Amino acid sequence: MRTTISQLKEMKQNKQKIAILTAYDYPTAQILDKAGIPAILVGDSLGMVVLGYDSTVSVTMEDMLHHLKAVVRGSQKALIIADMPFMTYHLSPEQALLNAGRFIQEGGAQAVKLEGGVNVADKVKRIVDCGIPVMGHIGLTPQSVNQLSGFKVQGKTLATALSLIEDAKALEKAGAFAIVLETMPAELAAIITAGISIPTIGIGAGEECDGQVQVISDMLGMFTDFIPKHTKRYADLNGIITKAVSEYAAEVTKGAFPTLKESFTLDKKVLEELKKCVL
């Protein structure tokens, strides 16, 4: 039985923090399920951390569906939320609904996430009215990175802070079940969290949010070239994997792997008969 939308809302009411992580493949989804993560986000961040793009803008519906299906197969308990990629919901409420429907019907997701506030409220309402749960996303919205002039903290002025509060209320009114608050002052995130009835999920938005989401690759230390300020590294998988691969390569090179322990053998009689046939 998967986590439900109602359960996430109850967690906010009971002041129980919600831990969410991204996943992009079958084995990671299995691990997160085993660890008790209540909701998994199949984020368009896969464009950067899996596919090697410079931003999330290049991610397609087909990219998302491919990875979404793997995560759904690997999980049994977590609520699966799928990110709607750039330009898959921007044109009209109907376009948004059709693509959200694909994530539910083809991909097996239980909810979708899209970026924006007041400007996408009509799309959120159209999707929700057809029975598909929607998670909102405001603050630093990576799909708008070109318009925002990079990955910068949002809501630092009075005008932009008030605009983000308006965005959050518009998403709540449109029927969103939760909102991601990304890269904004902690004080602003706390005000937004207290001002709406639905859960807020922070990423670089302080400790007062109702929950937190992190990119799995960041918190496990898969990359060494860039560490987001909002990330705490709980492991150094880059170092662990590099060491393991180096040891493997060295053992193969010097003939130390494989050994008899990792090999299969013929019955002695069969081997003798085989040698007679070929030698």
UniProtKB/Swiss-Prot annotation:
**Where is it localised?**
Cytoplasm
Classification via Gene3D superfamilies: Phosphoenolpyruvate-binding domains
List residues binding Mg(2+): 44, 83, 115
The answer to whether UniProt assigns keyword Coiled coil to this entry is no
What keywords are annotated for this sequence in UniProt?
Cytoplasm, Magnesium, Metal-binding, Pantothenate biosynthesis, Transferase
Active site at which residues? 182 (proton acceptor)
Catalysed reaction(s) here are: 3-methyl-2-oxobutanoate + (6R)-5,10-methylene-5,6,7,8-tetrahydrofolate + H2O = 2-dehydropantoate + (6S)-5,6,7,8-tetrahydrofolate
Q: Assembly and partners?
A: Homodecamer; pentamer of dimers.
Q: What is this protein called?
A: 3-methyl-2-oxobutanoate hydroxymethyltransferase
The species this protein was found in: Dehalococcoides mccartyi (strain ATCC BAA-2100 / JCM 16839 / KCTC 5957 / BAV1)
